[in-house]
């Protein structure tokens, strides 16, 4: 049994659409009727230190307009249900994850990857993003695969723990751990200050 496991490489990817200021304006507009909460919102955002966040979904031209996104899926007064959001996840998440994997494995012998672990709590579809990554990224069809879902940020820690157990039990194993989240997919209309602040903390990305 191998005594140690190591993180050999790390790669990341973010979508093309920078949306932080747009979402700040959208969130602030939800507090127009609550000036005290809006002032508190602005102070807390300034203290956050966040400058940029990215989304797989292009924002609309006007953050105060009827449509929040360019496609018109998020319309004020009629935000989409879970079904549309999961279809959007299925459309966008594999491509974003594939970008990170391609950066990680550039110039590497991909046949050496024996296991893939994917974590995500912002979307799900079947048969799964793990299969999409295997096909898109040219991984072995015999690779062993696992999805850790709906555990929040802690899922990444569990993925590392599982990878460690795998490598310690088989010294020939090489585990690819992929953490992908589309947090901006779950924006909602609300006047709740805490929820609006949470929308302004998280973005889309993969590591």
What are these regions (language model features)?
Residues 10, 119-121:
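Short strand-loop junctions, especially beta-strand C-caps/beta-turns
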Residues 1-113:
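Conserved "HGTGT" condensation-loop signature of ketosynthase/thiolase-family condensing enzymes
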Residues 2, 32, 87, 97-112, ...:
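Acyl-thioester C-C bond-transforming condensing/cleaving domain
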């Amino acid at each position: 049994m191998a005594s140690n496991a190591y993180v050999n490489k790390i790669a990341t990817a973010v979508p093309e659409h920078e949306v932080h200021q747009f979402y700040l304006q959208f969130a602030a507009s939800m507090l127009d009727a609550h000036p005290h909460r809006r002032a508190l919102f602005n102070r807390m955002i300034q203290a956050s230190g966040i400058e940029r966040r990215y989304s797989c979904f292009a924002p609309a031209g006007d953050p105060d307009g009827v449509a929040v996104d360019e496609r018109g899926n998020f319309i004020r007064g009629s935000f989409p249900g879970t079904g549309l959001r999961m279809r959007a996840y299925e459309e966008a998440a594999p491509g974003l994850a594939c970008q990170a994997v391609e950066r990680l494995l550039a110039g590497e012998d991909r046949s050496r990857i024996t296991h893939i672990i994917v974590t995500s709590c912002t979307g799900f579809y079947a048969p799964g993003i793990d299969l999409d990554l295997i096909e898109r990224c040219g991984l072995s069809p015999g690779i062993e695969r696992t999805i850790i879902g709906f555990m929040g940020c802690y899922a990444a820690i569990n993925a590392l723990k599982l990878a460690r157990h795998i490598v310690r039990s088989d010294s020939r194993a090489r585990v690819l751990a992929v953490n992908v989240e589309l947090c901006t997919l779950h924006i909602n209309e609300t006047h709740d200050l805490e929820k609006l602040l949470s929308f302004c903390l998280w973005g889309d990305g993969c590591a």
